């Protein structure tokens, strides 16, 4: 327990360092720009899982631009909904809305503008399915997670995680006009990855959530139960990630081989946290790696669609066939 007390200040500074060290303009801060790159990475991952990869430059730009604006709008609306809650937590009281650096009216107008431009980009430059899915992601984040589930249940992120899992569907729809098996697989992977990722962060910030009555799992059930839940979802993530071998049109063997060290590190950190659930250092390490893990998965999906990966796949298949004959 001494470790917990000693590392609380360090953890808050390290996990969300930029909020303390780099002050973003108020209008940009409410858009939560640090969340957008990972959402766009999973969008690209969804594209790479289809026969439509690679996309033309205009379609790619419209998809990523529309997705970024839809994500920004969701971030602003989330900040608007939670401005009173943010004002009651030390960690968030300095944010643009509770501190008065940005008016709610200005923020709301900005959110509507981002939503409209995102919809226009996606409808005109991509297709209606991609546009509809982006708006579904926005609504599910603001209404399903933020407004309905977050203040009411410890399983808020399990169900509400659907919002963060929609970008792969957008990517698949942008590439082919339909979702397909690969898009649904990456959607499912992000869904099972999300609880382990978010609960690691919630372990670090549980006293903030406790102070304002948000029923996050670490607050209600404690670190031991949370670490067990993280372990279950961590294993589910590892097992499901392997199905990317089948979901990829080409390069599946390359993906499977390169995936091994990612999964090994994830399980190592999950087990370390399970062995010492009170360690904020362990929770912080898992939280950070979980972000790199999902970025890495998406990068592997893209690399697996390269000519080099396809060639390596053919070489490995030929080698396996020779071994089976011998």
UniProtKB/Swiss-Prot annotation:
<keyword id="KW-0472">Membrane</keyword>
<feature type="transmembrane region" description="Helical">
    <location>
        <begin position="238"/>
        <end position="258"/>
    </location>
</feature>
<dbReference type="Pfam" id="PF01040">
    <property type="entry name" value="UbiA"/>
</dbReference>
<keyword id="KW-0808">Transferase</keyword>
<dbReference type="InterPro" id="IPR030470">
    <property type="entry name" value="UbiA_prenylTrfase_CS"/>
</dbReference>
<keyword id="KW-0997">Cell inner membrane</keyword>
<feature type="transmembrane region" description="Helical">
    <location>
        <begin position="35"/>
        <end position="55"/>
    </location>
</feature>
<feature type="transmembrane region" description="Helical">
    <location>
        <begin position="157"/>
        <end position="177"/>
    </location>
</feature>
<dbReference type="InterPro" id="IPR006369">
    <property type="entry name" value="Protohaem_IX_farnesylTrfase"/>
</dbReference>
<keyword id="KW-0350">Heme biosynthesis</keyword>
<feature type="transmembrane region" description="Helical">
    <location>
        <begin position="185"/>
        <end position="205"/>
    </location>
</feature>
<keyword id="KW-0812">Transmembrane</keyword>
<comment type="pathway">
    <text>Porphyrin-containing compound metabolism; heme O biosynthesis; heme O from protoheme: step 1/1.</text>
</comment>
<feature type="transmembrane region" description="Helical">
    <location>
        <begin position="60"/>
        <end position="80"/>
    </location>
</feature>
<keyword id="KW-1003">Cell membrane</keyword>
<feature type="transmembrane region" description="Helical">
    <location>
        <begin position="106"/>
        <end position="126"/>
    </location>
</feature>
<feature type="transmembrane region" description="Helical">
    <location>
        <begin position="129"/>
        <end position="149"/>
    </location>
</feature>
<feature type="transmembrane region" description="Helical">
    <location>
        <begin position="289"/>
        <end position="309"/>
    </location>
</feature>
<protein>
    <recommendedName>
        <fullName>Protoheme IX farnesyltransferase</fullName>
        <ecNumber>2.5.1.141</ecNumber>
    </recommendedName>
</protein>
<dbReference type="InterPro" id="IPR044878">
    <property type="entry name" value="UbiA_sf"/>
</dbReference>
<dbReference type="GO" id="GO:0048034">
    <property type="term" value="P:heme O biosynthetic process"/>
</dbReference>
<comment type="function">
    <text>Converts heme B (protoheme IX) to heme O by substitution of the vinyl group on carbon 2 of heme B porphyrin ring with a hydroxyethyl farnesyl side group.</text>
</comment>
<comment type="similarity">
    <text>Belongs to the UbiA prenyltransferase family. Protoheme IX farnesyltransferase subfamily.</text>
</comment>
<dbReference type="InterPro" id="IPR000537">
    <property type="entry name" value="UbiA_prenyltransferase"/>
</dbReference>
<keyword id="KW-1133">Transmembrane helix</keyword>
<dbReference type="GO" id="GO:0008495">
    <property type="term" value="F:protoheme IX farnesyltransferase activity"/>
</dbReference>
<dbReference type="GO" id="GO:0005886">
    <property type="term" value="C:plasma membrane"/>
</dbReference>
């Amino acid at each position: 327990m001494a470790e917990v007390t000693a590392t609380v200040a360090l953890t808050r500074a390290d996990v969300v360092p930029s909020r303390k060290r780099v002050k973003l303009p108020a209008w940009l801060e409410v858009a939560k720009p640090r969340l957008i790159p990972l959402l766009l990475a999973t969008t690209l991952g969804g594209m790479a899982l289809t026969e439509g990869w690679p996309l033309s430059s205009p379609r790619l730009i419209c998809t990523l631009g529309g997705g970024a604006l839809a994500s920004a709008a969701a971030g602003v609306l989330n900040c608007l909904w939670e401005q009173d809650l943010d004002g009651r937590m030390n960690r968030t009281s300095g944010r643009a809305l509770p501190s008065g650096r940005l008016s709610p009216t200005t923020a709301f107008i900005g959110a509507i503008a981002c939503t409209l431009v995102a919809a226009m980009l996606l409808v005109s430059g991509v297709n209606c399915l991609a546009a509809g899915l982006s708006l579904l992601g926005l609504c599910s984040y603001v209404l399903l997670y933020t407004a309905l589930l977050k203040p009411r249940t410890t399983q808020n992120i399990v169900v509400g995680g659907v919002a963060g899992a929609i970008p792969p569907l957008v990517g698949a729809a942008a590439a082919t006009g339909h979702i397909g098996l690969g898009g649904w697989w990456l959607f499912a992977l992000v869904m099972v990855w999300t609880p382990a990722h978010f609960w690691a962060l919630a372990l670090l910030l549980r006293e903030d959530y406790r102070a304002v009555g948000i029923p996050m799992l670490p607050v209600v059930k404690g670190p031991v139960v949370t670490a067990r839940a993280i372990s279950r979802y961590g294993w589910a993530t590892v097992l499901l990630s392997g199905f990317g071998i089948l979901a990829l049109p080409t390069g599946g063997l390359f993906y499977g081989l390169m995936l091994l060290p990612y999964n090994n590190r994830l399980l190592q950190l999950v087990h370390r946290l399970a062995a010492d659930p009170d360690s904020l250092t362990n929770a912080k390490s898992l939280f950070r790696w979980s972000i790199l893990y999902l970025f890495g998965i998406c990068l592997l999906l893209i690399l697996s669609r390269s000519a080099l990966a396809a060639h390596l796949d053919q070489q490995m298949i030929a080698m396996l066939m020779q071994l089976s004959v011998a």
